[in-house]
A protein has these predicted regions:
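N-terminal secretory/membrane-targeting segments
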Residues: 5, 22-23
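Bacterial N-terminal signal peptides that target proteins for export
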Residues: 1-9
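Bacterial N-terminal signal peptides
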Residues: 9-19
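Glycan-processing catalytic domains of CAZymes
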Residues: 24-176
Length: 176
């Protein structure tokens, strides 16, 4: 009897999933947006890869908007790839916007930029300008923070706590 109950439960779950899949695209109360990391956006230079990957996604989900990340871990997606990806999605009636993840190396304890370092600030600005060149709208991934404790940071921190110092630095970085 337990086995029959499990089968009935499994069939009920599959029926619900099937119903959700069939009715996908009939969204009335919300829009669906997805975020694509720079690693995958960079692969979009291969139109066959893009098309086959998008076919898998679009069979499962009716997407209204896609955020194409332009930078992550010092990988900057080139202009030609971004233009090709934007054109591909626009032809399908999908809005595009940009995204940025300000990391240097995620695998190294989420190494981020040091916002008191003028060279890092210059790179961050170049990434933002590169993204703004392609998109009227972009978002920052949740890596807009710093955990840097370089000599520059230690000197700039002075007598402030790390929390006070980082709040000050990131507020200023966000504004400028």
């Amino acid at each position: 009897m337990k086995r029959t109950s499990k089968r009935i439960l499994l069939l009920a779950i599959l029926a619900i999933i099937g119903h959700i899949t069939v009715t996908a695209g009939a969204y009335k109360s919300f829009k669906v947006s997805i975020y694509v990391r720079a690693y995958e956006v960079n692969k979009m230079k291969d139109i066959q890869w893009l098309d086959s990957t998008w076919n898998i996604i679009s069979k499962q989900l009716d997407v209204d908007k896609i955020y194409l990340e332009t930078h992550r871990d010092l990988l900057i997606v080139d202009d030609a790839t971004l233009n090709q990806a934007k054109e591909y999605f626009h032809k399908k009636g999908i809005e595009t916007a940009g995204g940025i993840t300000y990391t240097i190396d995620e695998s190294n304890s989420f190494e981020t930029f040091c916002y008191s370092n003028p060279e890092h600030r210059k790179t961050v600005q170049e990434i933002a300008e590169h993204t703004a060149k392609h998109f009227d709208e972009f978002i920052l991934d949740d890596f807009f923070f710093t955990s840097c404790k370089s000599d520059i940071e230690i000197k700039a921190k002075g007598d402030m706590s790390w929390t006070e110092y980082r709040l000050k630095v990131m507020t200023e970085a966000g504004r400028n």
